[in-house]
């Protein structure tokens, strides 16, 4: 099984990559992040992309599963950036996965999904 993980360099993403590296059912993992981390893991190759603006189709083509973990959680710092990543980014991930024919998509989100604000 080929898995693509968006937001792969975050806390949840790196924990998931470590688990996937030890899963015999997983043949390869693409860790997608805005910046490539130093972390090296078995079965994992890194790719850089911003889910809210970059082309995702090439990264998703041939994937069996996309796990979407790219989100921002601090609305007080930059609400527009949080909206762009959390809303626009998720819309783009869903569209790209559908267009690439990905069979399964797992989506987790942040507290930002509950519309935090003043």
Description of each model-found segment:
Residues 1-22:
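N-terminal Rossmann NAD(P)H-binding glycine-rich loop of SDR-like oxidoreductase domains
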Residues 2, 27-28, 103-104:
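Residues at the starts of beta-strands that form the adenosine-phosphate
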Residues 6, 32, 66-70, 105-111:
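SDR active-site strand-loop-helix element
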Residues 6-9, 85, 90:
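Ser/Thr-centric signal marking residues that sit
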Residues 25, 62, 101-102:
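Short loop/turn motifs at secondary-structure junctions
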Residues 25-34:
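Conserved glycine-rich Rossmann-like NAD(P)H-binding loop of the short-chain dehydrogenase/reductase
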Residues 38, 44, 48-85, 96, ...:
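NAD(P)H-binding glycine-rich loop region in Rossmannoid oxidoreductase-like domains
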Residues 88, 92-118:
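Conserved Rossmann-fold NAD(P)-dependent oxidoreductase catalytic core, especially the SDR/UDP-sugar
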